[in-house]
């Protein structure tokens, strides 16, 4: 996918990895970048606008845990303004296994609901033009960080959902791929709670191992967007971008 002159919606585009990715996207010259985030950050939006004045950067407050109907209303506003949207990035995520329901609601259900909502505008069975979805999942969807099993399971669920979306592309016209960052130096990983406090030092222990910067992750994210491979499972770890070949242990046969 060519980012230049495209219209992109980025859910949680002002977070750690999100903000650096928004910067890299803006540098690539889309026509519009619409940022949806729970917390307003006027300084960050102003920075993105200044980074490339030719790009129209717009912000809307959005909590991924709202009902699908509310998301559809917001998306209608955006589609009425832009007419077309080429790419949806679902990037909302929290890491706190003390908040079980919210972790699942943000990391998994929010991704499902936002995706479901945009299908009203994209699904070719409804006369839509199709589109592309990039879901930010995690390497913990491959192998869990067992001290945070709720977070890891939520990301595994998001990965499975994304893989299914890709296989439905011939029906819906909507393609999808997953972005799976490794341990990245963000506020998210500097301090977080393990499930039932099984390992109070889990954040500290993780950061003792090699990590990557948000900029490294963002630059590889943009490469994945440009590659635009339906069904791709991208691993963004230690400054590298690698396509993962998923081992099939079972097939439904349908």
Swiss-Prot record:
Binding site for substrate: 138
Domain of life of the source: Eukaryota
GO BP field: alcohol metabolic process
UniProt catalytic activity: a primary alcohol + NAD(+) = an aldehyde + NADH + H(+); a secondary alcohol + NAD(+) = a ketone + NADH + H(+)
Gene3D superfamilies from the UniProt entry: NAD(P)-binding Rossmann-like Domain
Statement: the UniProt record of this protein carries the keyword Manganese: no
Active site positions, chain numbering: 151 (proton acceptor)
UniProt entry tagged with the keyword Coiled coil: no
Record keywords: NAD, Oxidoreductase
Subunit description: Homodimer.
Stated name of the protein: Alcohol dehydrogenase
Gene name, Swiss-Prot/TrEMBL: Adh
């Amino acid at each position: 996918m060519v980012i230049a002159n495209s219209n992109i919606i980025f859910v949680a585009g002002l977070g750690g990895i999100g903000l650096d990715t928004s910067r890299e996207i803006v540098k690539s010259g889309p026509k519009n970048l619409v940022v949806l985030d729970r917390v307003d950050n006027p300084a960050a939006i102003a920075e993105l606008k200044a980074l490339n004045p030719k790009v129209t950067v717009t912000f809307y407050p959005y909590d991924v845990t709202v009902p699908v109907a509310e998301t559809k209303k917001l998306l209608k506003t955006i589609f009425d303004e832009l007419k077309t949207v080429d790419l949806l990035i679902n990037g909302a995520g929290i890491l706190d296994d003390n908040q079980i329901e919210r972790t699942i609601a943000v990391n998994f259900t929010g991704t499902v609901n936002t995706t479901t909502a945009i299908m009203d505008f994209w699904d070719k069975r409804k006369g839509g033009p199709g589109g592309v979805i990039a879901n930010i999942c995690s390497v913990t969807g491959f192998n869990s960080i067992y001290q945070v099993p709720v977070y890891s399971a939520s990301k595994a669920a998001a990965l499975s959902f994304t893989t299914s979306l890709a296989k439905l592309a011939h029906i819906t016209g909507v393609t999808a791929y997953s972005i799976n960052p490794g341990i990245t130096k963000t506020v998210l990983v500097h301090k977080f709670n393990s499930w039932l406090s099984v390992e109070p030092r889990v954040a500290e222990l993780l950061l003792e191992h090699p990590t990557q910067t948000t900029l490294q992750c963002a630059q590889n994210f943009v490469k994945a967007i440009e590659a635009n491979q339906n069904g791709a499972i991208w691993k963004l770890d230690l400054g590298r971008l690698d396509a993962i070949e998923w081992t099939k242990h079972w097939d439904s046969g349908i």
